[in-house]
């Protein structure tokens, strides 16, 4: 049977864990402290929205995405809305097939079913060459559950990784800039996503010209200011929608003058409309 444990009080999660992965049920606002694992892992929110913070940036993981965190990367989680988080650890041989940095992928129907199978009643019972060998979020790593045999578990994990290799990386990982001036602007955008100050105006606050900031954004993040601010706003929008707010409220709270502009930007990044997203589609 899986190890049932109540997570640390600050985390607020009820967890089922085994050597190759686990399942965490978090109330809205729950989360984990900073941690790192010896093996890379995938996290998927079967329900709710998960925010994954790493040293390199922040990833939003809604129900149609999966986030990859390489071995040794310090990270922490936070749930928005009641969140059912699934986690699968990968062996070094499989981890080498994925990026060497945090990434977010769109989840195909097959990948979703494999993730649910590996972390459901039958999954997670074996630690073979293509499985994992570390506990989940500070768990003791014991208590394997009966389920798939070693060979079947290995095949499922290989299918999952191949599905992710075929999937496009999604722009839901928000990298942290290195430059102090960009970091100051990042704090402003994150704290007040409805702020409509231009890049030139923000530059005056941090002591840099719009031209300098544009160059830094291109060099450090590979995006324009418009793309960066839109991504920050969509991150915030996913959280608000998970907390039960409608599209109109969310649009204005995130800085869009009208819902249609918000819907277009949201759909472009997330792959579905805010309404369908709230409805679970």
Residue ranges and their predicted role:
Residues 72-102:
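Ligand-binding loop in jelly-roll beta-barrel domains
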Residues 64, 213, 217, 261-262, ...:
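Short hydrophobic/aromatic patch on the recognition helix
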Residues 56-71:
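Short acidic-glycine-tyrosine-enriched beta hairpin
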Residues 196-200, 208, 219-263, 279-281:
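Terminal helix-turn-helix DNA-binding modules in bacterial transcription factors
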Residues 1-50, 59:
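Generic protein-terminus/edge-of-domain signal
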Residues 99-117:
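Aromatic/histidine-rich interaction motifs
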Residues 124-206, 219-231:
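Short, Lys/Arg-enriched, Trp-marked, Pro/Gly-tolerant hinge/linker segments that flank
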